[in-house]
């Protein structure tokens, strides 16, 4: 369910069409995107825009009730993992709900992206900078 404004028309459109429990992926520059899934490519060059910049814009617009993250981020990108957890804590406070955090293997994560409404690709070039956002409702 859409809750704000965003300039990118593709992102705005996909968020406005999300129903309860639909999913949307924000990923790094290297995640393979299934051909059957809508790709919204924001990457300009390495690191631009960053994963957290894209995620911040998307979560400002989207009501989130759960997220799925690859377990490997804890070991291979601990700094981003901590930044991500802090962002999710702040988002919970802003939205007034609890966001369930689910971990899975990176292989299972890649398989789950096929069921998403879209994959938004950032320019991030650090390992496991990927998240599946599960849409909530604002009421």
From Swiss-Prot:
<feature type="binding site">
    <location>
        <begin position="128"/>
        <end position="130"/>
    </location>
    <ligand>
        <name>substrate</name>
    </ligand>
</feature>
<comment type="function">
    <text>Catalyzes the interconversion of beta-pyran and beta-furan forms of D-ribose.</text>
</comment>
<dbReference type="GO" id="GO:0062193">
    <property type="term" value="F:D-ribose pyranase activity"/>
</dbReference>
<dbReference type="GO" id="GO:0016872">
    <property type="term" value="F:intramolecular lyase activity"/>
</dbReference>
<comment type="similarity">
    <text>Belongs to the RbsD / FucU family. RbsD subfamily.</text>
</comment>
<comment type="pathway">
    <text>Carbohydrate metabolism; D-ribose degradation; D-ribose 5-phosphate from beta-D-ribopyranose: step 1/2.</text>
</comment>
<keyword id="KW-0413">Isomerase</keyword>
<feature type="active site" description="Proton donor">
    <location>
        <position position="20"/>
    </location>
</feature>
<dbReference type="InterPro" id="IPR023064">
    <property type="entry name" value="D-ribose_pyranase"/>
</dbReference>
<dbReference type="InterPro" id="IPR023750">
    <property type="entry name" value="RbsD-like_sf"/>
</dbReference>
<protein>
    <recommendedName>
        <fullName>D-ribose pyranase</fullName>
        <ecNumber>5.4.99.62</ecNumber>
    </recommendedName>
</protein>
<dbReference type="GO" id="GO:0048029">
    <property type="term" value="F:monosaccharide binding"/>
</dbReference>
<feature type="binding site">
    <location>
        <position position="106"/>
    </location>
    <ligand>
        <name>substrate</name>
    </ligand>
</feature>
<dbReference type="GO" id="GO:0019303">
    <property type="term" value="P:D-ribose catabolic process"/>
</dbReference>
<dbReference type="Pfam" id="PF05025">
    <property type="entry name" value="RbsD_FucU"/>
</dbReference>
<keyword id="KW-0963">Cytoplasm</keyword>
<dbReference type="InterPro" id="IPR007721">
    <property type="entry name" value="RbsD_FucU"/>
</dbReference>
<keyword id="KW-0119">Carbohydrate metabolism</keyword>
<comment type="subunit">
    <text>Homodecamer.</text>
</comment>
<dbReference type="GO" id="GO:0005829">
    <property type="term" value="C:cytosol"/>
</dbReference>
<feature type="binding site">
    <location>
        <position position="28"/>
    </location>
    <ligand>
        <name>substrate</name>
    </ligand>
</feature>
């Amino acid at each position: 369910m859409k809750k704000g404004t965003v300039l990118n028309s593709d992102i705005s459109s996909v968020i406005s069409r999300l129903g309860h429990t639909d999913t949307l992926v924000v990923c790094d520059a290297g995640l393979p995107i299934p051909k059957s899934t809508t790709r919204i490519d924001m990457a300009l060059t390495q690191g631009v825009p960053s994963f957290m910049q894209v995620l911040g814009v998307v979560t400002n617009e989207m009501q989130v009730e759960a997220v799925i993250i690859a377990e490997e981020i804890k070991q291979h990108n601990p700094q981003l993992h901590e930044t991500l957890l802090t962002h999710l804590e702040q988002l919970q406070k802003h939205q007034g709900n609890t966001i369930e955090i689910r971990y899975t293997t990176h292989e299972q994560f890649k398989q789950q992206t096929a069921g998403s409404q879209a994959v938004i690709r950032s320019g991030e070039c650090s390992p496991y900078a990927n998240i599946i956002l599960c849409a909530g409702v604002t009421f």
